[in-house]
Amino acid sequence: KFLKRNTRPTFHSVILAGVYDIKNLKHRIREDREHQMNSPWNIAADFPVDMSFTVEEIEGMLNEYNDEHSCVMLVRECAKTIFEYTSGYPYLVSKICKLIDERCGENWTKQGVSDAVKILLREANPLFDDLRKKITDYPELRAMLYAILFRGESYPYNPDNFAIDIGTMFGFIKEKNGQVVIANRIFETRLYNLFLSEELTNSIIYQSGERDKNQFIKNGVLDMELVLEKFMIHFHDIYGDNTNTFVEENGRRLFLLYLK
């Protein structure tokens, strides 16, 4: 439309609002034989609007829904629990509410939210597909997320760091008290599951956990002391000859594989 602006009415200007900075977009608005540089008037302006929902905003949405549908709903409890899982990430907030409404028997309670989250973490959707694709496309981001989750490493929040900048732009990480943290519990769990699933098939510690699983529930309660005891036995048998550095770097990951 821009190239034909002299023969037909068109926009005076175009504003793009989205995830990518305009300086990272490759546009061709002229013939290939002409220069390809962006106009100096293309300005990537900051968009200082926090798109995340607060607990109060989630509560307001639930109140509106409750007024329209006359549900039995523990509004404040649901709003707080949804926020604890999502940190207000809009897609996740809406998705959890949709799952409660359609697949959890309209159980608008803390348990209903928990059930919806379990369904969400098991399903494929465009957001999680994009998460997986992005960490494949950006190995620096993947390495940082892996180190945070499994080695407990901390990274000072520095937007000049490429991995931090790209992770923030996609909404996968955020700044908290000057440090990089995973954006919300659902992303954290999904990433745990993704990284662990790549190791399950050939993991001896995982196979040991599978064999021990039936021993861990007693009278409907998880016997955590027995879990730790059994894990330490298997860990010593399998990895006892490794160095302290190996234990420090891999202990958390191996324990999660055992629990998986």
Give the location of each predicted region.
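Sensor-1/coupling segment of RecA-like P-loop NTPase cores
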Residues: 1-36
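Conserved nucleotide-binding/hydrolysis micro-motifs of P-loop NTPases
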Residues: 19-24, 54-58, 100, 187-188
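A short helix-turn-beta junction within AAA+ P-loop NTPase domains corresponding to the substrate/partner-engaging
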Residues: 29-51
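Conserved adenine-nucleotide phosphate-binding loops and their immediately adjacent elements
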Residues: 38-42, 208-214, 229-239
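Winged-helix-like regulatory helical subdomains adjacent to P-loop NTPase cores
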Residues: 46-47, 54-170, 176-177, 206, ...
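Minor-groove-contacting beta-hairpin "wing" of winged helix-turn-helix DNA-binding domains
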Residues: 179-184
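Short, amphipathic alpha-helical interaction segments positioned at domain boundaries
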Residues: 187-217
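Acidic-basic catalytic patches of nuclease active cores, encompassing PD-(D/E)XK
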Residues: 223-259
